[in-house]
Amino acid sequence: MALRRPMVAGNWKMNGSAQLAQELFKKFATKLQNDSAEVVLCPPTIYLESVRQQLDANKEALNGCLVRMGAQNLSQHDFGAYTGEVSGQMLKDSGCRYVIIGHSERRRMYGETSDIVAEKFAAAQKHGLTPILCVGESGPAREARRTFEVIAEELDVVIEKNGTMAFDNAIIAYEPLWAVGTGKSATPEQAQEVHAFIRKRLSEVSPFIGENIRILYGGSVTPSNAADLFAQPDVDGGLIGGVSLNSTEFLSLCSIAMSA
């Protein structure tokens, strides 16, 4: 069985501040115990530099604990007249290691199709970033028992456009749309069922990738349900939304992941 390091990725969405970055790192420096889990902060682009400064300032205090920086989105284009967009190279220059691709809010609010998501996935890898690909079904799709069908389609488009080894350097986040920001989380059993399907699906393309890829759960994860979710054999941590803005609760999730 592969030893997959758990990850807790905090997606601030359009929230946060430089002060929040400072507050988080102050607690990281005294509370994070080891490198058994990886912590990723994904602030709005304007605060990437604030997080980077805190990473540099607290490097010694973190004592080897794995705290990384990620972005919430990138352009599929390398450069050009794309007002308001940020390229993969720009994110790499800013110190990012990860970038969230295809979040349900981007797909729903900004019309990002699966083809666009696949292009952004490729752009991230081209510039040395690890994409965190979000997949998930809507409430009606789950009720119609189409969960696996929807997720398979979202995975297959990425493979078709980027090749069978596309997920060799990637992370997947399963975020059921009916749980994102609603306060209603999937049960541990529901999460495990879908994560196992994703792993099996990718194993059909590459057994190595299927066994080793990290699959996060995202959707109303809190300190009260994280332990049961993270204990599932195919759940490798969480993509965290609202709770990532509360330094105490987010640190609690990190501690739970480290002991999972």
From Swiss-Prot:
Active site per UniProt: 103, 175
Enzyme class (EC, first level): isomerase
List of residues binding substrate: 11-13, 181, 220, 241-242
Enzyme Commission number(s) from the entry: 5.3.1.1
Gene Ontology cellular component annotations, sorted alphabetically: cytosol
GO MF annotation, one: triose-phosphate isomerase activity
Cellular compartments annotated: Cytoplasm
Subunit structure: Homodimer.
Family: Belongs to the triosephosphate isomerase family.
NCBIfam families membership: tim (TIGR00419)
Protein name (database record): Triosephosphate isomerase
Originating organism: Shewanella woodyi (strain ATCC 51908 / MS32)
